[in-house]
Swiss-Prot record:
Name of the protein: Probable transcriptional regulatory protein Adeh_2184
Xref: PANTHER family: TRANSCRIPTIONAL REGULATORY PROTEIN YEBC-RELATED (PTHR12532:SF6), TRANSLATIONAL ACTIVATOR OF CYTOCHROME C OXIDASE 1 (PTHR12532)
BP terms from Gene Ontology: regulation of DNA-templated transcription
InterPro entries tied to this protein: Integrase-like_N, TACO1_YebC-like_2nd/3rd_dom, TACO1_YebC_N, Transcrip_reg_TACO1-like, Transcrip_reg_TACO1-like_dom3, YebC-like
Amino acid sequence: MGRIFETRKATMFARWNKMAKAFTRISKDIAIAVKGGGPNPDNNPALRRVLQNARHLNMPKDKVEAAIKRASGQDQQAYEVVVYEGYAPHGVAVMVETATDNVVRTVANVRMHFKNNGGNMGNTGSVAFQFRRMGVFRLAPEGIDQDALELDLIDHGLEEMGESTGEKGEKVLVIRCAFESFGQLQAALEQRKLNVLSSESEYVAQTPVQLPEEQAREVLELVDALEQDEDVQHVFHNLA
């Protein structure tokens, strides 16, 4: 077949694996949201947010509906959200957010990933002080008067707003608020019928650090290993 075919095949499988991981993460988010607020998105802001993220990822509707149905059943696995902390190589701080039905398995796996990739897992609070938990919304910027929107949303918890680049190279408007204002800002955006692409809580690094390319690659190897773990939902770090 040749090298070009093998390269394309590897790229295709990598894309499929990434998509499968994203769908698994969304399914867990659905289970947690339904358990916390019921299966009706009209009455469950957390579920509305997750369904919004599912649409942004092009998760098939039948998979979304199946996840809601499973989450509504009595035999649905109960997931516990647990956050682990540690250091990657070269002192980079890492926060690992998991959703697990077996904490013993998860903590062992997370510790193994740190150890096998030159890092070390820490105790609760060992690196959390270097991050701030925030609500982060990503919007399509087309048709938005950003100055007017910023003034409008300040009273609803808005703290930061600016343009960024999405995974496909598209322009994205990023809005941040304190985690405590997440629900208030979500309601304000919904009321204004803005095109919100995704919204999540994130641990935002307060002081990002820069490393030479080779050292940064070592850090990202740990991040990649953690992200591939079935129990890991998100990995946050302070590498610039």
